Structure formats: structure tokens, C-alpha cells
A protein has these predicted regions:
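Membrane-interface alpha helices of multi-pass inner-membrane proteins
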Residues: 264-267, 286, 299-314
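Membrane-embedded, hydrophobic transmembrane alpha-helices
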Residues: 1-91
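Extracytoplasmic
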Residues: 473-627
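Transmembrane alpha-helical segments
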Residues: 104-109, 222, 226, 312-316, ...
């Protein structure tokens, strides 16, 4: 049924393209294609979810969503501006930036996502952790049909406070019959087109130059700090970049280097970031044109685009709010305070405010208020320590992590034009907030905000560098200077991407895959399994079934209090009893190598004496408790 999935996605992307054409009828394909992908993915997240809340996340809801979106596409095609090719002088520059990164991205997705090697699934360094969680969420939503979903990594009653629409965009294709790899990758391909293309287009619009946009593009996606210096001391240290586990010039915690490459360490492994930026970057483009270029009619399209954003990536939604606040202040200060100017802002705020409030009230907003270690004060991101001190000097921390872009921010700000400074004001608001307030248990995750501040800084620095070197009359010297700056600013990321391309880790064995397939075919969709808390548990990650206690590396950082489930897991393995099994609603109990390595006194004989052996393969055995 993969063909059906491709057709389904095409319907949403076609509708997105039609919306992009209607919003900007004079734009070339270099705008319409990535902007259309952004709209299409946004529709894919929002429309099926609206029907699924009422009908369940089942085939009828998905087909109704497709019918509505198809009808929208037909209406827009018939009543919109007739499609004509318009001059697009910047297309070559955009694709010259996007296509090389697209090739690298496709290769990494191929080797990192359920890559079958000799019967086992392999992955790369960056996906060894997070992908196991995303696969489980995607599968669980598809098999249970519940939206909002249950939280499948814990027994008992727990709110699903994670932005789950970044998962439903793949769950859709599982319901339609696609295999797990296809379902996982399909929406990511469209999202990457949006992210890459709509990072370049705002840069072009803000800076007024294709050359500056290209430099900003590479500074953001391939920029890095001075971490590579730590590996120049010996050939052995340099070679360790390509063999160690997270010993790269952009992720070397021994020297407090933590400003990772956004492609290999954010977009590929972290779906919320990818799908958040897939909507946020087109939104920044529309915000600039809506506010700074006075195209007030665009507020409708901007609102439509960002409707699902809080449940795709909450950090991106917050970043957009702060940037819009800066642009709103600009409107009040620099433009006439007339109804024609202010009313679009009011309508935009009203529509998004109401929809976002409904989306977040019982999900991410509630979780941020009553979850464990969520909303709190903390100084200087990951450089700050719990006692209020800093690991490194504040400025040195960012100099060595971000490098040339950070060093040039102040001169770039004063070099910028007034409207560019106002836009960067939104970035400064993001920086200030992220440096003092943490929104989740993992301080590190505030980088989802900091990278948007950094993106706006890359725009200003690219403009500064291009203007500086344009004053150098001798073209060879101009080229040499730019090349030197690019080398200093990007060498660390080049090494990091090279390391990621070479990385190869075993993730799930053939026996794990076979067990997950059996569970998928034979276990009840709402069954609860007792397993170890390994982050690679195939019962959850591959079969999508709920487990009593998942890995602390997941549940803790989702703000969950899992003490009761963790203690119950150990008790049910070491000192089991039927009352506790019934209390936690356990339907199946798994014994495998993870159980015996992590729980030394696991008592399989107690279960073998009382319950039938439901499944056995290699070193894995499952006992059926109920029925």
C-alpha cells in the first residue's frame, strides 16, 4: 500500500502548492515549491487530527481529511490565479544551495532510518537514541487509533505532553498500509524541502541579495565554532573524530563544545525540530512580507500555516510569538496606527490564540505547568550549573561554540538596515528568554530556541561579510578572504557531517524484528507489556505497544514522575505476585537479554510455572498473563 501513501501525501502537497500560489501569485517556483511543502505538511498534521479527535485515528477519519484537502486543492486550482511560469532569476542560486544538502540528507536518512543490514536494523550515531522513541510513538498512535494519544512509555494514567503532531504525520501512512520505513520517511522528505528552501528565501527577502542569502544558508546549516582546534594536536585525536561516539568538533562535551550541527544532530534525529522548522521557516518568510513589506493580506495564509505549530514543535511556536512581538512593536512605532494596519495583526493574534489555546490546554501547556522539572529559572543554557556558576566564561563559551558568526554579531547589527535590526530584535528576545528560563527538564533543549536567534544572526553576518568583501577590488583577494572566512566558520561542521556519514551502529536484531512482527500481528492493540526499561525495547519501538516503564532517558525528559512504574517494574520481575500484575493491568511479560542484564534477580521461573509461553525466539520469551 505504499503507492496509496504516496498518492495521499501528493494530495496534501498539491493543496499546499495551490495555497502558496494563491498567497503569492507572482512568486516563482523557487518560492512556491518549498512554501507549498510547508503548507502541505501543515495540512497533513492539522486536518487528519481534527477528524481523528472525533472519529479516532482510523481510516475513515484519514479519508475524510483527504477528501476535504482534495476539494480545497480543486477549488483553489479552479478559482486561483492561472499557473504561468514567471521569471525566477534566483532559482539557480537557491537550488545550488539546497541540492547538495539534499543529497547528503537523503544518504543519511537511508543509512540511519531502519536500514536493513543482514537481517538487522542499523542506524547512525545521531539516531541511535531518539529514533527509537519516535518509532514507538508513531506506531502506537496508528495501532491504538487514539487522539490525543495515550502515553505509551508508562503504565497508569499519564498525560501525553509531547508535541505529538510531529508523529501523526507518519502514523497516517501506517494506517494507510505503508511499511514503517516508508511511513517514517515520507513526510520528512517534504519537510526537508520546506526547511532548506524556506531558510534561503527569507534570507533572500530580508537581505535583498541572492549571494548574501547563499552565505547565510551555509553559515546556518554548516556553520560551527572553534571546536575543531581541540582535535589538531595529534593525528590520533583527529582520527578520533571519525571513530568515537560523539567526539566531534560540534559535540565534544569534555571541552564544553555543545553547539551541534543542525542537520545531523537536530533535523534528522529530532522530528519535532524538523517539522517545527518546516512550518516556522515559511512563517518567517510570510511575517517579513506581511510586516516589513506591508502585504497585510498575508495574515490569513500565515495563520493557516501555523495552526498546528504548538503540537508539532512548541519551541518553534514560542520563537514565532517572540519574533511576531518584535515585528508588532515595529508596526506600532514605525507605521501609521490605522485600522488597515493594525486590524490584520489583531485578527492574526485572535485566530492563532484561540486555536493554539485549544490545542495546548490539556497537552503541552498543562504539562509545562505540572510536569516534573519543567518551567524554571536557569542561567546561560548548558553552560550554567545548578549552583548558579558557569563552566566557562559567558562570552568565551559562545565564541568557541558558535565561532565567527558570534564574533561578528555586534558589527553586523550596526551594519544592518533598520528593518533587519527590528527582525533581529525578535532573535534577541529569544536569546534573553532562553538564557534565563528553561521549559523542560533537559536544559540542553533550550537550543531549539537559541538556533532561531542564531539563524537571524547568520543573516546579519552574511550581509556584513559580503558588503565588506565587495569593497575589495581584486577579485582573487576577495575570493580568498571569503573562502578563509567560510573555512573558519564551517570546518567543524564539515568534519561532523563526515563522521555522521561514516557512523554505523546495530540497533535491532533479526530476532527483535521477528518478535515485534509477531506482537504486531497477534497482541491486542491496547495490551500492556512488562519489559525492561531499555531505550531500544522492540515491544514499544517496533510494535508500538504500551509498556509499564520506558527508558528514563525518554520519560524523565518528558517531565514524567515515573517512580511508581520503575519500582513496579523491578518488583514484578524480582518478586512477582498476581495482585500487582492485575493492579498494573499487565497482559504480557517479556524476558530477554535486556531484562537479565539490567535486573539481576529476575524470576522467570515464577511466570513459567503459572502462565503459558506465548512467544519464544532466540533469547526472548513472552508469557501471556490474561486470557
Amino acid at each position: 500500500m505504499n503507492i496509496f501513501s504516496f498518492v495521499y501525501l501528493a494530495v496534501f502537497l498539491l493543496a499546499g502548492f495551490c495555497i502558496a500560489r494563491r498567497a503569492l501569485p507572482q512568486a516563482g517556483l523557487s518560492v512556491s515549491i518549498p512554501l507549498g511543502c510547508g503548507f502541505g505538511v501543515s495540512l497533513l498534521a492539522f486536518v487528519p487530527a481534527c477528524f481523528a479527535v472525533v472519529l479516532g485515528f482510523r481510516l475513515p477519519a484519514l479519508l475524510l481529511a483527504a477528501a476535504v484537502v482534495a476539494a480545497l486543492a480543486v477549488w483553489l486550482a479552479r478559482h486561483g490565479t492561472p499557473f504561468t511560469r514567471v521569471p525566477d532569476p534566483d532559482a539557480a542560486a537557491l537550488w545550488a544551495c539546497v541540492l547538495p544538502l539534499a543529497v547528503v540528507t537523503l544518504y543519511l536518512l537511508h543509512t540511519h532510518v531502519l536500514h536493513l543490514v543482514d537481517g538487522s536494523y542499523h542506524t547512525g550515531q545521531s539516531c541511535y537514541g531518539d529514533m527509537a522513541m519516535h518509532l514507538g510513538f508513531i506506531k502506537n498512535i496508528a495501532v491504538t487509533g487514539k487522539l490525543p494519544p495515550v502515553y505509551p512509555l508508562l503504565g497508569g494514567e499519564h498525560r501525553f505532553g509531547y508535541p505529538f503532531l510531529c508523529e501523526t504525520v507518519s502514523s497516517v501512512f501506517l494506517v494507510l498500509g505503508a511499511d514503517a520505513r516508508t511511513a517514517y520517511l515520507l513526510p520528512m522528505l517534504a519537510a526537508f524541502i520546506s526547511v532548506y528552501g524556506m531558510m534561503w528565501q527569507p534570507a533572500r527577502q530580508v537581505l535583498g541579495s541572492a549571494g548574501k542569502a547563499c552565505l547565510a544558508f551555509w553559515l546556518f546549516f554548516m556553520g560551527s565554532g572553534f571546536g575543531f582546534v581541540y582535535f589538531l594536536g595529534s593525528a590520533e585525536a583527529f582520527a578520533g573524530i571519525f571513530t568515537g561516539f560523539y567526539t566531534t568538533p560540534t559535540n565534544y562535551t569534555a571541552e564544553n563544545i555543545v553547539w551541534v550541527n543542525p542537520i545531523v544532530d537536530l533535523l534528522i534525529p529530532q522530528r519535532a525540530t524538523l517539522f517545527g522548522w518546516c512550518v516556522l521557516f515559511p512563517a518567517l518568510y510570510l511575517v517579513w512580507r506581511f510586516c516589513m513589506e506591508e502585504e497585510t493580506r498575508l495574515w490569513r495564509y500565515l495563520a493557516l500555516l501555523v495552526l498546528p505549530l504548538p503540537l508539532m514543535h512548541t519551541h518553534s511556536a514560542l520563537a514565532l510569538v517572540l519574533i511576531c512581538l518584535a515585528c508588532g512593536v515595529y508596526t506600532l512605532v514605525c507605521r501609521p496606527r490605522t485600522k488597515a494596519v493594525l486590524a490584520p495583526w489583531g485578527w492574526f493574534a485572535l485566530v492563532c490564540g484561540l486555536v493554539w489555546l485549544v490545542e495546548m490546554w490539556n497537552t503541552v501547556f498543562a504539562q509545562s505547568l505540572d510536569g516534573q522539572h519543567m518551567l524554571r529559572l536557569h542561567l546561560n543554557w548548558i553552560n550554567g550549573q545548578d549552583d548558579g556558576t558557569l563552566k566557562d566564561n559567558y562570552f568565551w563559551f559562545y565564541i568557541k561554540n558558535i565561532g565567527l558568526v558570534y564574533l561578528l554579531l555586534i558589527p553586523a547589527f550596526f551594519h544592518a538596515k533598520p528593518k533587519q535590526r527590528w527582525l533581529y530584535g525578535g532573535g534577541l528576545a529569544i536569546l534573553v528568554l532562553a538564557e534565563f528560563v528553561v521549559f523542560q527538564p533537559n536544559n540542553y533543549d533550550n537550543n531549539k530556541l537559541l538556533y532561531i536567534w542564531h539563524l537571524l544572526g547568520c543573516l546579519l553576518v552574511a550581509s556584513l561579510l559580503m558588503d565588506w568583501f565587495s569593497k575589495v577590488r581584486a577579485i582573487p583577494w576577495r575570493a580568498l578572504g571569503l573562502c578563509l572566512c567560510c573555512f573558519i566558520a564551517m570546518f567543524g561542521s564539515v568534519l561532523t557531517v563526515g563522521r555522521e556519514a561514516l557512523s554505523d551502529y546495530w540497533q535491532w536484531s533479526a530476532d527483535d524484528i521477528a518478535m515485534a512482527d509477531y506482537i504486531d500481528d497477534n497482541a491486542e492493540t491496547d495490551a500492556v507489556f512488562l519489559t525492561s526499561d531499555s531505550h531500544l525495547c522492540p515491544v514499544f519501538s517496533l510494535a508500538g505497544r504500551r509498556i509499564l516503564c520506558g527508558s528514563g532517558s525518554f520519560v524523565y525528559y518528558h517531565g514524567m514522575n515515573y517512580t511508581a512504574e520503575y519500582n513496579a517494574m523491578h518488583q514484578l520481575y524480582e518478586n512477582p505476585d498476581e495482585v500487582s500484575l492485575a493492579q498494573w493491568g499487565i497482559d504480557y511479560v517479556l524476558f530477554d537479554s535486556y531484562v537479565f542484564s539490567n535486573i539481576q534477580n529476575a524470576d522467570e521461573s515464577w511466570y513459567a510455572a503459572r502462565y503459558p509461553l506465548w512467544y519464544e525466539n532466540g533469547g526472548s520469551r513472552i508469557y501471556k498473563i490474561n486470557g
